[in-house]
Each structure stands twice: as C-alpha cells, then as structure tokens.
C-alpha cells in the first residue's frame, strides 16, 4: 500500500478537525469548546490542530473558505451560460452546505457566509462598474434569501429558490 503524502495527511487531518468541531457545535456552546476537545473528538493531537489552524475561529473560516473555493472551481468547470442555471447551481451547492450554515447562523457568524458568497462572486464578476453593481445586487439577494431559507427550515428546493429569485427580480425592477 502506498504511503500517504504530507498533503494528503494534512487534508485528512483538516477534514477530521472540521467534522469533529461541527459535531461538538451541535451539542455544546461555541465558547465552551476548546481546541483540546476538538483534537480529542477528531482523534488528533492539539499540535496537529495548531499546525493547521491558528485558532478555533480559523477552523470555521477555513472550512467556509474551502467550501467557497470548491464551489467556484465547480462553477468554472461547468461553464454555466445563463443566470437561471447559475442561480440553480449556486443554491444546489448551498443546499448541501445547509447544516454548517445553520450552525454558523446560530452563532451569529453570518459574515463568514457572506465572505463565501463574495469569494464566489469574485471568481466570476466581470470588472466593469455596471457588472460590479449587478453582481453585488445578485449576491446580496442570494445571501439574504439563503439566510431566510435556513431560518424557514430549508423547505424549498434549489429550483424553487431560483424561481423565487426570478419572480422577486421581475417584481422589484
């Protein structure tokens, strides 16, 4: 059997830490969770956690950033050619992210979610004044619709959310 590379071990450690931290967040208050508790739940040493993350805040920030990077990479490879497909794709990925997002919203860390939205936008925004306004309007709408969707129990499908966004845009503008 081939030996795992350092990069693979690092990725595995990070994934274990993410999973452990989110499991702890389901049952314990954020402030009461220690790096030692995260390490124990992940089955790694405290040093392994600190080699990968400066703090427990950075665990959350890194998790959200990595999610946004994966979505941006998928969007690039999909070559999405219409706003409707873009919105449906984005809400499909965000639907998969709902459990971590609910935890972050419950911790009043919505700004981390907004940073993810902005990061995804930055990969695709055409650098013109008009496009910047357009993208910011669109991302703001996605962000607050996503938060509302989380608060309402995630009842609608990504396709239904896309239709809702299109309806709102038509009525608003």
Range-by-range predicted roles:
Residues 16, 34, 48-50:
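Residues in the helix-turn-helix
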Residues 31-37:
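Ser/Thr-centered, proline-biased regulatory motifs
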Residues 89, 106-144, 159, 167-173:
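Amphipathic alpha-helical packing segments from all-alpha helical-bundle domains
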Residues 43-53:
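Short hydrophobic/aromatic patch on the recognition helix
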Residues 12-23, 27, 41, 58-78, ...:
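Alpha-helical structural segments
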Residues 1-10:
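N-terminal intrinsically disordered/low-complexity leader segments
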Residues 76, 80-115:
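Helical hydrophobic small-molecule/effector-binding pocket
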Residues 32, 55-60:
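Short amphipathic alpha-helical segment with a characteristic S/N-K-E followed by hydrophobic residues
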């Amino acid at each position: 059997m081939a030996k795992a590379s350092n990069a693979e071990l690092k990725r595995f450690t990070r994934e274990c830490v993410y999973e452990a931290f989110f499991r702890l967040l389901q049952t314990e208050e954020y402030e009461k969770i220690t790096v030692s508790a995260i390490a124990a739940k992940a089955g790694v040493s405290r040093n392994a956690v600190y080699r990968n993350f400066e703090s427990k805040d950075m665990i959350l920030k890194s998790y959200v950033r990595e999610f946004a990077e994966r979505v941006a990479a998928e969007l690039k490879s999909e070559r999405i050619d219409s706003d409707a497909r873009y919105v449906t794709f984005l809400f499909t990925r965000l639907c998969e992210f709902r459990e971590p997002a609910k935890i972050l919203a419950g911790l009043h860390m919505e700004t981390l979610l907004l940073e993810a939205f902005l990061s995804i936008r930055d990969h695709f925004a055409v650098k013109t004044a008009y496009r910047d306004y357009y993208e910011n309007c669109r991302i703001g709408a996605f962000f607050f619709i996503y938060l509302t969707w989380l608060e309402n129990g995630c009842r609608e499908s990504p396709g239904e959310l896309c239709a809702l966004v299109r309806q709102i845009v038509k009525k608003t503008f």
